Structure formats: structure tokens, C-alpha cells
Amino acid sequence: AKMKADPLNKLHWRRTPARLQAEVIRDSLLEMSGLLDTKMYGAGTLDERMKRRSIYFMIKRSKLIPTMQLFDSPEPLVSQGSRPSTIIAPQALHFMNNAQVREAAVALAGQFEKKTEDGDAISLAYQTVVGREPTISEKKSISEFMNAQAESYKAGGRNDARKLALADLAQVLFGLNEFIYVN
């Protein structure tokens, strides 16, 4: 009915999902994991491993920060009235393979590990990363995933199998559209 009344969305009754900006994605990862250095002011840096907010990155045209470029940070050579927002496969691969994303996931897992049961940890992970409770089917699938991951880590001789399985869960949640898009 709403679509018939306003097919062009002139009354703004629906919203097109928008991807978060590069700086917001990076800062959110650091904040959720407890790794964010909230120190204000001071010199900027080109070191991508820095734990301060992304606003403290220096812009050097000959040495751009790959993660920021991947998520469409502003081009420093030209003036831009608005940012483009691309959706490309390397963005998803970034959440699967980036060392900083893994570091944030392990730190976040350390917070979840304090929960006594995996079900509680799964709910806490969902609430922290995507802001909602998991559905029953999501909880079941993730519980199976975490059990398989923990068994794999145990078979590899790891003593911290549960924490690593929780880190895998956090890393999966970081890659969800619900984390990087605003509806």
C-alpha cells in the first residue's frame, strides 16, 4: 500500500540501507573490542596499527592506508562533495583475513569468555556487535559452528579452544551486513 502511494519515496517512509564510512567501521571494531585508545589531540600517524580513532591518521598522498581505501575513504588529491560507497568482494575478505580484525575479535572474545555458557556468550556477542538477540536458528547454527571450531582447535593442541572459537564467532559477526550497514 505504501509503495503504491509513494513509489518514489518522496515522503521518506522507507530508507535505503547505507554502509558505514571507513573510519566508523574501524573505530567501531576498536571500541567494541576494548582496544580503542581514547586519548585526544596529539600528532597524527601513518601507522595502520594505531589504536586511536581514525581521525588521527595523517593523509600522505604517496602512502594511503589500504583499509581506509578499501572502504572508500576520501581521495586526498581531489575535492569531493560526497563519498562513493562501493560494495566489492575484497571488503568481505578484509573481515576474514585482516590481522587487525582478528586482533579485535580475539580481544572481544576475551570479554565473552567470562560468560559461563556458550549460549550466554552467543547472545552477548550478537547484542554487542549487531545490537540484537540471535534468532533461535542462528543460535543453533552458531552453537554448532563454535563446537566444531573448538574441537578443531583442541585437535590442534590448543588449550584456549573456547576463546578461539569465540574469536571466530566475533570475526564472523564483524563481517555481517548488519554490522557495516545502517538500515
Where are these regions (language model features)?
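Short amphipathic alpha-helical interaction patches enriched in hydrophobic/aromatic residues
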Residues: 129, 150-153
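An acidic, gly/pro-interrupted, aromatic-rich
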Residues: 1-129, 133-135, 167, 173-183
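Charge-dense polyanion-binding interfaces
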Residues: 152-178
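Amphipathic alpha-helical segments that form the core helices of the histone-fold
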Residues: 140-151
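Long, internal low-complexity/basic segments
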Residues: 137, 141-142, 162, 166
